[in-house]
UniProtKB/Swiss-Prot annotation:
Keywords, comma-separated and alphabetical: Cell membrane, Cytoplasm, GTP-binding, Membrane, Nucleotide-binding, Ribosome biogenesis, RNA-binding, rRNA-binding
General function of this protein: An essential GTPase that binds both GDP and GTP, with rapid nucleotide exchange. Plays a role in 16S rRNA processing and 30S ribosomal subunit biogenesis and possibly also in cell cycle regulation and energy metabolism.
Membrane association type: Peripheral membrane protein
Binding site for GTP: 13-20, 60-64, 123-126
Family: Belongs to the TRAFAC class TrmE-Era-EngA-EngB-Septin-like GTPase superfamily. Era GTPase family.
Protein known as: GTPase Era
Length: 297
C-alpha cells in the first residue's frame, strides 16, 4: 500500500501572479478572494485538498513586495513566518511576464528556508504564447535546482492534476489526515464574509484605494420572523475622499457592492442574507499600530 502523505504547501511570488486563483482551483472552492489589484491577499489562508493518497494543505500568502507602510511590513513578516513552517514552497511566476528583480529577490530568499522543498510553478499559461511559456520554463530552470517545474493554468484547469501529484509526492508520510474530511479551509465564517465584501469593493476602484480598504463584521443576527440572517459590516477607508468614492453618488456604489457580495455569501451560508455595510474613516490605519491591531493585523 502506498504511504499516506499529509503536509503544508505555500505558494509565494510577487503580488498578482495568480496564487489565490491557483489555490481556489486546486481546492475546488473559492476560499481566497481574487482581484487584479496587487496585495489582495492579506492573511495566510489555508485551503485543504483531500485525496485518497493524502491531504494537501495549501497556504495562500500575501505577495512579497517592498513595503511602504506598517501593514506592508506585517504582511511580509507573515509570509516569512509561514514559509518557515511549510513542507513545500511553490514559487509562482506568470508565463506572460519576464522574470524581474522582484522574482529574483524572492528566489534568493528561498534559501532562508532549507527545510522546505522547492517547486517552480509557471502560472497563467493560458495568457501566453507557447514560445513564451517555453522561454519562461528555461528562465525559471536557470534560477536554481527545483524538485519540479510545472506550467499551469488555474483558469482553464490545465496541468492541475500534474501539479497536485508533484506536490503530494514531496509531502511527509503521515499516519492520517491533519484536517477532517469535510474541511476545505480553516477560515472562520465571519472572516470569509468580510473577505467577500472586500473583494466586491475592489472591483473597479482606483489603484491607490485597494490598500486603504479593510472590512470587519460587527454582528450576525438571526431573524425570528423569517429565515434570514442579518449581517452588519464595517468598511474602513483612510480618508473622507475615499469614503465618497466607495459610497458613490446617492449610495449607488455601496449598493452595488452589497449586491455583488451577497451572492458568494449566500452560496457559502446556503441561505438568504440581509447585508448592511457602514463606511467609516480610520485615518491612515495602515501606518497606525493600534488601528492595525483593531482591524486584525
Amino acid at each position: 500500500m502506498t504511504d499516506y502523505r499529509a503536509g503544508f504547501v505555500s505558494f509565494v511570488g510577487r503580488p498578482n501572479v495568480g496564487k489565490s486563483t491557483l489555490t481556489n482551483a486546486l481546492v475546488g472552492e473559492k476560499i481566497a478572494i481574487t482581484s487584479s489589484k496587487p496585495q489582495t491577499t492579506r492573511r495566510a489562508i489555508r485551503g485543504i485538498m483531500h485525496r485518497r493518497e493524502g491531504q494537501l494543505i495549501l497556504v495562500d500568502t500575501p505577495g512579497v513586495h517592498r513595503p511602504r507602510t506598517l501593514l506592508g511590513e506585517r504582511l511580509n513578516t507573515l509570509v516569512e513566518s509561514t514559509l518557515g513552517d511549510v513542507d513545500v514552497i511553490g514559487f509562482c511566476v506568470p508565463a506572460d511576464e519576464r522574470i524581474g528583480p522582484g522574482d529574483r529577490f524572492i528566489n534568493e530568499r528561498l534559501d532562508d528556508y532549507p527545510r522546505a522543498k522547492k517547486v517552480a510553478i509557471v502560472t497563467k499559461i493560458d495568457s501566453a504564447r507557447k514560445t513564451q511559456v517555453a522561454e519562461q520554463l528555461l528562465a525559471v530552470s536557470a534560477l536554481r535546482e527545483w524538485e519540479a517545474i510545472v506550467p499551469v493554468s488555474a483558469v482553464n484547469s490545465i496541468q492541475l492534476d500534474t501539479l497536485t501529484t508533484e506536490l503530494m509526492r514531496l509531502l511527509p508520510v503521515s499516519p492520517g489526515p491533519l484536517y477532517p474530511d469535510e474541511s476545505v479551509t480553516d477560515e472562520g465564517v465571519e472572516d470569509r464574509i468580510a473577505e467577500y465584501i472586500r473583494e466586491a469593493v475592489l472591483d473597479g476602484v482606483e489603484d491607490e484605494l485597494p490598500h486603504s480598504l479593510a472590512v470587519t463584521i460587527d454582528d450576525l443576527v438571526e431573524r425570528d420572523d423569517k429565515d434570514l440572517l442579518e449581517i452588519y459590516a464595517n468598511l474602513f477607508v483612510e480618508r473622507d475622499s475615499q469614503k465618497a468614492i466607495v459610497i458613490g453618488k446617492g449610495g449607488s456604489r455601496i449598493r452595488e457592492v452589497g449586491a455583488t457580495a451577497r451572492e458568494p455569501i449566500e452560496a457559502l451560508l446556503g441561505r438568504h442574507v440581509f447585508l448592511s455595510i457602514r463606511v467609516k474613516v480610520a485615518k491612515d490605519w495602515q501606518r497606525d499600530p493600534k488601528q492595525l491591531g483593531r482591524l486584525g493585523f
